[in-house]
Amino acid sequence: MAFYPLQIAGLVLGFFGLVGTIGTTLLPQWRVSAFIGSNIIIFERIWEGLWMNCIQQAMVTLQCKFYNSILALPPVLEAARALMCVAVALALVALIIGICGMKQLQCTGSSERVKAYLLGTSGVLFILTGIFVLIPVSWTANIIIRDFYDPTVHAGQKRELGGALFLGWATAAVLFIGGGLLCGYCCCNRKERWHRYPVPAYRVPQKDNQRNVTVPRKSSTSYV
């Protein structure tokens, strides 16, 4: 029970990481229209996400449309889709394993060792989820920044960083922290059990010639 707060904090952060991963995957604000040069259209904003693009007109009307073809999408978008879907699945599995490893739920019996390993596994999966979220978000941001400063790209085709990218970075940080706490609990639990049950000292067996031999005591009777 000494490390119970680490379990709670790690699982709570993991839950928020799962919610953030789902939000980052579904939100269309990965790429937003840039207002530079002659492209100053303040009454229309364009959002581009993994699954749809949206056009907001006059800050009131919002029209969204899913991408019609999967094969016609850019390879970067297809890779980002795949990585984010894997991230959602990993976060969900990690959360389920972490809940089963909690001390209050007797899913694993009374073995503290099994529970610690389950929470450690959950932490590793949360960290992997953070990596899977960080890769497509940072990759997309790098492409946006590169095209923004590329003079050969038309001003109407340039985009800026959307809110979903910032949400993805924050989600990756939360997943790293939550996974680190759960892995830390697993390590601390192993050290605690190591000190609680010290290794018994090794005793060298005695040889046969070193055994104690009882010598009969001589009688003290005096002969007259």
From Swiss-Prot:
Topology of the protein relative to the lipid bilayer: Multi-pass membrane protein
Cytoplasmic topological domain residue ranges: 1-7, 103-124, 186-224
Compartments where located: Cell junction, Tight junction; Cell membrane
Reaction catalysed by this enzyme: chloride(in) = chloride(out); hydrogencarbonate(in) = hydrogencarbonate(out); bromide(in) = bromide(out); iodide(out) = iodide(in)
Swiss-Prot/TrEMBL keywords: Cell junction, Cell membrane, Chloride, Chloride channel, Ion channel, Ion transport, Membrane, Tight junction, Transmembrane, Transmembrane helix, Transport
Span of the signal peptide: none
Keyword flag Nuclease: no
Gene3D superfamilies listed in its UniProt record: 1.20.140.150
GO biological process entries: calcium-independent cell-cell adhesion via plasma membrane cell-adhesion molecules; paracellular transport
Transmembrane segments: 8-28, 82-102, 125-145, 165-185
MF-aspect GO terms: chloride channel activity; identical protein binding; paracellular tight junction channel activity; structural molecule activity
Extracellular side: 29-81, 146-164
UniProt key word Transcription: no
Chain's role: Channel-forming tight junction protein with selectivity for anions, including chloride and hydrogencarbonate, and for solutes smaller than 9 Angstrom in diameter. In the kidney proximal tubule, may be involved in quantitative reabsorption of filtered anions. Does not affect water permeability.
Annotated protein name in UniProt: Claudin-17
Organism (species): Mus musculus (Mouse)
Organism lineage string: Eukaryota, Metazoa, Chordata, Craniata, Vertebrata
Gene behind the chain: Cldn17
